[in-house]
Amino acid sequence: MQEIPEKPLSQPAGTEIIEKYFPHLSERQREQFEQMGGLYTHWNALINVISRKDIDNLYLHHVLHSLGIARMLNFKPGTSVLDLGTGGGFPGIPLAILFPQVSFLLVDSIGKKVKVASAVAEALGLDNVRTMHCRAESIGEKFDFIVSRAVMKLSELAKICRKLIRREDQQNALPNGLICLKGGELQHEILPFRNKAMTEELWPTFEEEYFKTKKVVYLPL
């Protein structure tokens, strides 16, 4: 078994849980995930982007949860992804570490949250990440996929996202579309898309109890 190096005391423990489910990370990726703890602890004390009582659960509730999108699809190199309503950088920043050859645009309508996401991405050396303070209606680009984390109801999200999806150059295992992280009972929310949407339960693939109600929803657009 590979020995996991001791983490600096200034960083919250928890990167072991990332390596548990993603054991083939490069040394650079491991370093970036480790650095996230200290960076978010610092920035969250200045600008509240994560509940302060939840910052100790950063790796389980935020980083690993974000990486649940990779359980639905492994993005191919050259894919372009929009993280809509990124907040402080979730799910976009963990995904950008996992997929260094994929380009990510992280967008939020709240400027102080974008400031945190931008600072963290820069500190991590994520050259594949851009950030933008704007609303979805102001985005003038198209993307292969849009990801989000419980931003709004699926029907509202789909309506906003349709015009932002690139129709040509389909290169991934799933057609271009929307992938979002959801929790709780989704039957009513997914009903209008029952013939198109795919739902993936994160538990027991992620065996921690936190994930028992967590799902990934994919909708081709």
UniProtKB/Swiss-Prot annotation:
GO molecular function: rRNA (guanine-N7-)-methyltransferase activity
Residue numbers binding S-adenosyl-L-methionine: 85, 90, 136-137, 149
CDD domains per the UniProt record, alphabetical: AdoMet_MTases
Enzyme Commission numbers on file: 2.1.1.-
Keyword Transcription listed: no
Subcellular location: Cytoplasm
One Pfam family cited in the UniProt record for this chain: GidB
Family: Belongs to the methyltransferase superfamily. RNA methyltransferase RsmG family.
Name of the protein in its database record: Ribosomal RNA small subunit methyltransferase G
Organism per entry: Porphyromonas gingivalis (strain ATCC BAA-308 / W83)
Organism phylogeny: Bacteria, Pseudomonadati, Bacteroidota, Bacteroidia, Bacteroidales
The encoding gene: rsmG
